Regions:
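Acidic (Asp/Glu-rich) sequence patches and key acidic residues
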Residues: 1-168, 178
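Conserved GNAT acetyl-CoA-binding A-motif
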Residues: 170-173
Length: 178
């Protein structure tokens, strides 16, 4: 089943937490570099293998519903504490994102300003306005990058429903990255 109707984001923090792809945040990935499953359908295998062989794909991996269902949403990455997202009020469709360590880098604060009550006391998502910018900070956890404000719950709902019929280990998500 193609994920396009369910998931149409390119969130590298999520891909890093699940598969280790572009894992700039430093998450401990759940299913890194597994390649294609040995029992993958021949049609999908031939399509994906040709893309990987041609250098059009970075790599492939897969993860079972059993593994996804056991994820710890409070798990944090090793390199960063949060993610800043901002956009101009006049261009809400053009989002900018930056992963931030603790303390926040001065260049990030110069762009987005200082949230109230301050960058070091934010325990949950915080939104604020700086001039023409709408800004948001969220702590960086597995739950934040795969949670309800993302498109992943749609994917997980379908996988959970299929697992009800085929078992938790009988349902998996197969991915390939360019």
């Amino acid at each position: 089943m193609d994920l396009w109707p369910l998931y149409d984001q390119a969130d590298y923090a999520a891909f890093g937490s699940l598969f280790g792809v572009r894992n700039h945040a430093g998450f401990h990935p759940l299913a890194p570099d597994r390649g294609l499953p040995v029992d993958l359908s021949s049609g999908l295998r031939s399509q994906l293998e040709s893309w990987v062989a041609a250098g059009d794909m970075y790599g492939a991996s897969w993860v079972s519903w059993a593994e996804l269902a056991s994820l710890d949403p409070a798990a944090t990455p090793g390199h960063f504490v949060g993610r800043l997202t901002w956009h101009a009020k006049s261009l809400p469709s053009v989002l900018h994102q930056q992963l931030v360590p603790d303390p926040w880098p001065p260049e990030a604060l110069a762009v987005v300003g200082t949230p109230t009550p301050g960058p070091h006391s934010t325990m949950g998502p915080v939104e604020w306005t700086t001039g023409e910018l709408m800004c948001r900070y969220e702590p960086l956890t597995v739950g934040a990058v795969l949670g309800p404000e993302t498109h992943w719950p749609h994917v997980f709902a379908v996988m959970k429903a299929l697992a009800g019929r085929f078992g938790d280990d009988g349902v998996r998500l197969v991915v390939a990255f360019d």
